Amino acid sequence: MSDGKDSLDLSGLGAAVPNAKELSAEDKANLVESIKNTLQGLAARHTDVLESLEPKVRKRVEVLREIQSQHDDLEAKFFEERAALEAKYQKMYEPLYSKRYEIVNGVVEVDGVTKEAADETPAEQKEEKGVPEFWLNAMKNHEILSEEIQERDEEALKYLKDIKWYRISEPKGFKLEFYFDTNPFFKNSVLTKTYHMIDEDEPILEKAIGTEIEWFPGKCLTQKVLKKKPKKGSKNTKPITKTENCESFFNFFSPPQVPDDDEEIDEDTAEQLQNQMEQDYDIGSTIRDKIIPHAVSWFTGEAAQDEDFEGIMDDEDDDDEDDDDDEDEDDEGDDEDDEDEKKGGRVPAGEGQQGERPAECKQQ
């Protein structure tokens, strides 16, 4: 479990990232060697900085580095203890998640519901069990996930019964599991997404692996079939069909793949791939850190309102800082005006008008 504040670091990987399908022992050795070379280059650069300092200043910086080293040792222990603490509480959460699963899927009934339901439900209406479309609505209420869920995905996601996540140690990372009821779209009862990390504390993604979905004929949601009428005069009178990939939440289970080492990849393609991998990680970490632990709050919309409120407060803080900056600029302008008047001069008209512009115009 993360605190949700980690950001995926893919910088420096570029086109040299090993094949995402599987890292061989040789690939891993090459990756480690590449990282070592990068670190050695950075160390050499740091040495140059130290050598450029005066002896007394250099000595002070060396002592500061020793202090930093002690801090890093403590931080490493913190990460170790945090992982153990998270594992402890994850086990304590499990019974609560099990109760949630049973209520959501109608396995058990909560106290007092049976009699109330009998009194309120019309005789001709079939009584619904559990909480219908619980996970679908929980995810739709999150801004990032709602952009991924297409209208045609919703019918399939109504069959989603539960979402779980597990930390994995070899290799480091985490795994998401999506449990589905029997449905008319695909055979799989469980769809998984696994993230392998080079470093968990400073998350650097090695690769992501998703389940291959076994779609029933004509039910694939990640592709659409286009039918085109044949040209006039053509001997073939049957419509021409063409299959194209389309946007879908279920593309999440087919993560971006890094090309093989021997394939050339230009800078633009590498940047595009990096952005795709970062977005994919954001979706996975959002489900892990926000949706799973606070599912009912996302279902009701409370969590979305809380995030909106936090965003408004952050914006107001930014506006206050901008206003303070503007006041400082105005004060400086007033001082300059006073000086000019003392000297018998006047502020040019153009400058005076510019000083009266709204703050947002100055920032453009």
From Swiss-Prot:
Residues 362-364 form a propeptide. It comes from the Eukaryota. The modification Cysteine methyl ester is found at residue 361. Residues 259-269, 304-340 have a biased composition (Acidic residues). It is found in: Nucleus; Cytoplasm. Keywords: Chaperone, Coiled coil, Cytoplasm, Lipoprotein, Methylation, Nucleus, Prenylation. It holds the Pfam family NAP. One of its GO terms (biological process) is double-strand break repair via homologous recombination. Residues 32-86 form a coiled coil. GO terms for cellular component: chromatin; cytoplasm; nucleus. The keyword Lyase does not apply. Residues 250-269, 301-364 are annotated as: Disordered. A lipid is attached at residue 361 (S-farnesyl cysteine). Its main location: nucleus. GO terms for molecular function: chromatin binding; histone binding. May modulate chromatin structure by regulation of nucleosome assembly/disassembly. The acidic domain is probably involved in the interaction with histones. Belongs to the nucleosome assembly protein (NAP) family. This is Nucleosome assembly protein 1;2. The gene is NAP1;2.
